[in-house]
Amino acid sequence: MTWPFAVILLGGYLLGSVPFGILVGRMFYGVDPRTVGSGNIGTANSMRAFGRTGAVLVLLGDAFKGAAPTFVALRFLPDPWMAAAVGLATIVGHNWSVFLRFRGGKGVATTLGVVIVLSLPAAVAFGAVWLLTAAVTRYSSLASILASVAVPVAMFLLRSPMPYVVYGIVALALVVWRHESNIRRLAAGTELKIGTKKAT
């Protein structure tokens, strides 16, 4: 492991660890999203806690966490495997934040931020699948899982470099893992829908 790679990898994890959902809530709304709705710090629960504007701020912040270190890795590191690893490090940081005692979100927006840098067409596929699924089902969790499935599929069909396809597969696995409780609630019919503030 070269020192530039180590520095960028660690920087990616640390930036990924910044909890934008909590920062936006406390700075602008006086609300901790962990006390609202699903208790998650990501975009969907931020919509419940702060409304649309706050949710957009969280989305942009969380996507930036993935995009910025990945862009730096592509620019300054020689191997695409390194860029893919840095992208994954940002997701790990978001999901298991050093600033939140290794707890965190589910990594969906951060995954998207990385994909925007690695493959813009795959990011478009992610967004299209998310929007379609959310519009039809009103389940953000299901939309996030299916959108994450679209990433490695799109990258494979577009013949993206193998490290990017592997990134997409690992990122999908992380998204599914972090949505384990959502999947159980979807199966039980108790999952929160978009716009719902608390479970019924």
Residue ranges with predicted function:
Residues 47-51, 73-76, 93, 108-137, ...:
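Interfacial segments of multi-pass membrane proteins
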Residues 124, 140-148, 159-171:
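Loop-to-transmembrane alpha-helix initiation sites
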Residues 31-43, 99-112, 139-147:
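Short, non-helical or kinked segments that cap or interrupt transmembrane helices
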Residues 21-24, 93-103, 130-137, 180-184:
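C-terminal ends of transmembrane helices
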Residues 1-28:
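N-terminal signal-anchor transmembrane alpha helix
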Residues 22-53, 182-200:
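Cytosolic, membrane-interface loops and tails of multi-pass inner-membrane proteins
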Residues 4, 8, 53-99, 118-122, ...:
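Nucleotide and nucleotide-moiety/phosphate-recognizing core
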Residues 12-15, 90-94, 130, 134, ...:
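Alpha-helical transmembrane segments of multi-pass membrane proteins
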